[in-house]
């Protein structure tokens, strides 16, 4: 049963094995984690613009083979629209991709795992954990 949705930075920490505590938590929670297709897009973008795109894309492919990737769907879009409006009213916006990942996690009732808790904690009804 899925419990956690990993943010992009936690995926990168896991891939690089730094800090080691993130990899340990990743290994302990096999079968309970997923990423959003939005996170996959961010990982691919980072690899494509890197100095070694082929190598980095292969690493991402290996990582993604060990975790569920959830498609961004209508429920996620609905939650994202609500989050964007709530944060705009408060004058406390977050980045568009973080809004989408937050909306996706909230729509599925998942805990977002991130080291960027300051951004995600602004989102009502979203639970966060920092494994770093």
Curated annotation (Swiss-Prot):
Pfam families in the cross-refs: PIN (PF01850)
Binding annotation for Mg(2+): 7, 98
Domain of life of the native organism: Bacteria
UniProt keyword annotation of Transmembrane helix present: no
Keywords: Endonuclease, Hydrolase, Magnesium, Metal-binding, Nuclease, Plasmid, Toxin-antitoxin system
Coiled-coil parts of chain: none
GO terms, molecular function: endonuclease activity; magnesium ion binding; RNA nuclease activity
Residue span(s) of domain PINc: 5-131
Entry's induction text: Degradation of tRNA(fMet) is induced by chloramphenicol treatment, suggesting the antitoxin is unstable.
Top-level enzyme category: hydrolase
E.C. number: 3.1.-.-
Cofactor(s), names only, from the UniProt record: Mg(2+)
Regulation affecting activity: Inhibited by EDTA.
Function text: Toxic component of a type II toxin-antitoxin (TA) system. A tRNA-(fMet) endonuclease, it cleaves both charged and uncharged tRNA-(fMet) between positions 38 and 39 at the anticodon stem-loop boundary. Does not cleave tRNA(Met), tRNA(Arg2), tRNA(His), tRNA(Leu), tRNA(Phe) tRNA(Thr1), tRNA(Tyr) or tRNA(Val). Overexpression in E.coli inhibits translation, leads to loss of cell growth and degradation of tRNA(fMet); these effects are neutralized by expression of cognate antitoxin VapB. The VapB/VapC complex probably regulates transcription of its own promoter.
Family: Belongs to the PINc/VapC protein family.
Assembly, per entry: Forms a hetero-octamer (4 VapB and 4 VapC) complex with antitoxin VapB. The complex binds 2 different sites in the vapBC promoter, probably via VapB dimerization.
NCBIfam families assigned: PRK13725.1
Protein name: tRNA(fMet)-specific endonuclease VapC
Organism field: Shigella flexneri
Lineage: Bacteria, Pseudomonadati, Pseudomonadota, Gammaproteobacteria, Enterobacterales
Gene (UniProt): vapC
């Amino acid at each position: 049963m899925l419990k956690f949705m990993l943010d992009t930075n936690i995926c990168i920490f896991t891939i690089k094995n730094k800090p080691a505590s993130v990899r340990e938590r990743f290994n302990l929670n096999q079968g309970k984690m997923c990423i959003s297709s939005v996170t996959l897009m961010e990982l691919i973008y980072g690899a494509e613009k890197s100095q070694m795109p082929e190598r980095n894309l292969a690493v991402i492919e290996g990582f993604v083979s060990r975790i569920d990737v959830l498609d961004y769907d209508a429920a996620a879009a609905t939650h994202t629209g609500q989050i964007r409006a709530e944060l705009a009213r408060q004058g406390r916006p977050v980045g568009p991709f973080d809004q989408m990942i937050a909306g996706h996690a909230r729509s599925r009732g998942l805990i977002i795992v991130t080291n960027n808790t300051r951004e995600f904690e602004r989102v009502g009804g979203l639970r966060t954990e920092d494994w770093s």
